[in-house]
Amino acid sequence: MNYSFLVLLLFISVVLFILFYINKEAVILYSNTGLGKFIAIILILSYATFHIGMGIVALIILLSYYKVYGYESWNILNTIDFLDGIDVIYYINLERSKERKTIIEEMFKDNIFYGKPIQRIDAIDGKDPTEQVYDKLVINTKRNSKLEYACLLSHLTTIRTFAESTLYENALILEDDMTIELKKFWRKSLRTVMENAPADWEIIQLCYITGGLLKSDYTLNNYQRNRYGGIASMGAYIINKTAARKLMTEMYDPVTNKFSLRDYHTHEADHYLFKVLRTYTYKYPYFIYPTDNTSTLHPEHLNSHIRSKSRIEYMYYQLSY
């Protein structure tokens, strides 16, 4: 019997055991690779072959991981299609934001996006003096800046594009500064996220900025002010076809090509859409802003983005589900 091989296997098990109970983040990073799980299975087979006791130890370690992180985390060769349930992806990008376009298109080369229809939506530029933002709206009282209305218009245009499509039922809408930095924490497909959501959902928010962590997996977000200041961000969200068409029936006039806004809602994109559509914020965001993100709309919000991101990352590191 090759005892040096057994010693090596035992050493690897001890390291994994320590990582599991001391540093869950390391285990998450390790186990999120198909190679990691493949090695784990090889360890079990090797132990079972050379020493039944060691095989049992390895099996206990892996079953402990399964108990903590759940069935869907047991993705041996990364076979979970995390974007399952999403029929189309739209990303909103200003014509002048060339660098952002390059970065997000590079992100789309990741395997998780393979086979998904992806469409760029030309954002309305509120800083362009020739852009007649207000001519595209029917409003009685201007409540916000031209930049805010341009942002809202960009999202409404995207939703209208989706509503008019005939092939898709669920769309993922992204702003062009989204990242998949949180991918290493993903455990469920978006189909599962949608199936587990309250039955009346119209939007599911997959990126958020808030002053505190959420308690429930799904939090109704009608943008009521709370002690944390609300749950903001239109960075990433799922919208279903029924909701998109309902919204366009209410707001969009194809004859005049204008959107009518209710006067009793704040005319900021997240405030407005979360008020008029049944929106739930998913506690475990899939997308997040880069740490050095400078918003084209609110560059002064950088510090709040950083603080919120830190809280979310801490939540994931402490996560046991």
Can you describe what each PLM-predicted range is?
Residues 17-18, 61-70:
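Alpha-helical transmembrane segments and their membrane-interface exit regions
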Residues 5-12, 29-39:
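Short hydrophobic alpha-helical membrane-embedded segments
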Residues 29-32, 52-61, 74-76:
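A cytosolic-side transmembrane-helix exit/cap motif
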Residues 38-49, 57-62:
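Generic transmembrane alpha-helix motif of multi-pass integral membrane proteins
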Residues 20-32:
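Short, amphipathic, aromatic/basic-enriched membrane-interface segments that mark the entry/exit
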